[in-house]
Amino acid sequence: MDVGVFIPIGNNGWLISENAPQYMPTFELNKAIVQKAEGYGFDFALSMIKLRGFGGKTEFWEHNLESFTLMAGLAAVTSKIQLFATAATLTLPPAIVARMASTIDSISGGRFGVNLVTGWQKPEYSQMGLWPGDEFFGTRYQYLGEYAQVLRDLWATGRSDFKGEHFQMEDCRVSPKPQADMKIICAGSSDAGMAFSAQYADYNFCFGKGVNTPTAFAPAAERLQAACAKTGRHVTSCVLFMVIADETDEAARAKWEHYKAGADEEAIAWLGEQGAADKGADSNIRQMADPTSAVNINMGTLVGSYANVARMLDEIATVPGMQGVMLTFDDFLEGVEAFGQKIQPLMQSRRHVTALKESA
């Protein structure tokens, strides 16, 4: 099973809590995280894009780096780990993204890919006059399909004459082409999102569900496989989980309860308000805004001893259609270190990594 890290490009990572570590995003922090992850054999690192945060006492996600420029910098200071940047497709024409991606492909030696997002938080785009209207909620995957086709054309052939409803290319050119096959990621979970991933993506990200229920996301992976049966393409799932681990279950649970007790209710309320704006929202967005465990945006959470977290991660690997897991941590530097030293060596699904380290 592949393992990746969802790096903290926004302040405070993924915990909306006054009791969680409070920090600003910097290149140096993310460099330290990704270099440490690479040293422990992580397969990939991905950064999101966020253009406006949730406010509240913690000013959650009000402070963010930009994804492509961050990953370009990280490409220059890493050598093995795969890197993915996120394109907010309402802000960047596909031909520009194709050229930026080709540039980072050159910097990284073929270790780069792109995560495509349509945009669900209206204020991110309306603040700069780029929101196309609320009808976009219903047409965004048609838009994204055209966007992805232009990217595929340019990366494969260096030119595009695509003519669609949203994009019209006229002998559009990008050179040099990427040296490696450029992977596309999406995180759709609605029927339209799954259909898009089955047609255009290489991997589809989904949210884990619940606390210490590692395989509860399996229906999402099953739905993706059903969508792929219609397109004849092989697309696999990667699932997002937060790891809160310690020497004992009790110590890990105490940290989790402490974070929940300090939840930034004002920021969480903003998240719920924005998530409700799209009446036909992807279940990812509805899940993020659910008040049940909104302190970490309702991503799946693994709370326990290092041994029990390793066991639960191995359970994830048994789900059909799984490619890998993408992890966040309450404290990223400590979390990646603990994963590499105390969790990964106990995982059967990572024996190929630990065996290499043992023989080195």
UniProtKB/Swiss-Prot annotation:
Enzyme type, top EC level: oxidoreductase
EC number: 1.14.99.46
Source taxon at top rank: Bacteria
Coiled coil: none
Entry's Gene Ontology molecular function annotations: alkanesulfonate monooxygenase activity; uracil oxygenase activity
GO biological process: alkanesulfonate catabolic process; nitrogen utilization; uracil catabolic process
InterPro entries (UniProt xref): Luciferase-like_dom, Luciferase-like_sf, Pyrimidine_monooxygenase_RutA, SsuD_RutA_monooxygenase
Reactions performed catalytically: uracil + FMNH2 + NADH + O2 = (Z)-3-ureidoacrylate + FMN + NAD(+) + H2O + H(+); thymine + FMNH2 + NADH + O2 = (Z)-2-methylureidoacrylate + FMN + NAD(+) + H2O + H(+)
Binding site for FMN: I49, K50, N115, E124, R140, Y141, S190
Keyword NADP: yes
Keywords: Flavoprotein, FMN, Monooxygenase, NADP, Oxidoreductase
UniProt similarity note: Belongs to the NtaA/SnaA/DszA monooxygenase family. RutA subfamily.
Function: The FMN-N(5)-oxide reacts spontaneously with NADH to produce FMN. Requires the flavin reductase RutF to regenerate FMN in vivo.
Protein name as annotated: Pyrimidine monooxygenase RutA
Organism: Stutzerimonas stutzeri (strain A1501) (Pseudomonas stutzeri)
Taxonomy of the source species: Bacteria, Pseudomonadati, Pseudomonadota, Gammaproteobacteria, Pseudomonadales
Name of the gene: rutA
